[in-house]
Amino acid sequence: MPMFVVNTNVPRASVPDGFLSELTQQLVQAMGKPAQYIAVHVVPDQLMAFGGSSEPCALCSLHSIGKIGGAQNRSYSKLLCGLLAERLRISPDRIYINYYDMNAANVGWNGSTFA
């Protein structure tokens, strides 16, 4: 059930076609989870500042049942910051990513939970 959310001040017109699919496929490879369970949500055009500047920035979160931890998170940070830099032109030092290891009983899907 990985869910990756990107809140950014980058305009919608600057989000390339296929970006959501690319994020999904990269997360499939990085996390070893099936694409059918991965959700990606990009929220452009946000009123945001990072370090007092309104230059392009992003505040992100990655939620998952398992596959969250120190070494894994460093790997995800490298991958995701790289994609955001390349595709949205956001400098990696203007990106925060929060990681959440979810309890399966606290994640609802398809009329039930993952527990």
From Swiss-Prot:
Sites of N6-succinyllysine modification: 78
Residues recorded as bearing N6-acetyllysine in the entry: 78
GO CC terms in record: cell surface; cytosol; extracellular space; nucleoplasm; plasma membrane
GO molecular function, one term: chemoattractant activity
Active-site residues, record numbering mapped to chain: 2 (proton acceptor)
Main location: secreted
Gene Ontology biological-process annotations: cell surface receptor signaling pathway; cellular senescence; DNA damage response, signal transduction by p53 class mediator; inflammatory response; innate immune response; negative regulation of cellular senescence; negative regulation of DNA damage response, signal transduction by p53 class mediator; negative regulation of gene expression
Enzyme class, broadest EC rank: isomerase
Reactions performed catalytically: 3-phenylpyruvate = enol-phenylpyruvate; L-dopachrome = 5,6-dihydroxyindole-2-carboxylate
List of residues binding substrate: 33, 65, 98
Annotated SUPFAM superfamilies: Tautomerase/MIF
Compartment annotation: Secreted; Cytoplasm
Alphabetical keyword list: Acetylation, Cytokine, Cytoplasm, Immunity, Inflammatory response, Innate immunity, Isomerase, Secreted
EC number: 5.3.2.1, 5.3.3.12
Record function comment: Pro-inflammatory cytokine involved in the innate immune response to bacterial pathogens. The expression of MIF at sites of inflammation suggests a role as mediator in regulating the function of macrophages in host defense. Counteracts the anti-inflammatory activity of glucocorticoids. Has phenylpyruvate tautomerase and dopachrome tautomerase activity (in vitro), but the physiological substrate is not known. It is not clear whether the tautomerase activity has any physiological relevance, and whether it is important for cytokine activity.
Family, per entry: Belongs to the MIF family.
Subunit structure comment from the entry: Homotrimer. Interacts with CXCR2 extracellular domain. Interacts with the CD74 extracellular domain, USO1, COPS5 and BNIPL.
Descriptive protein name: Macrophage migration inhibitory factor
Species, as recorded: Sus scrofa (Pig)
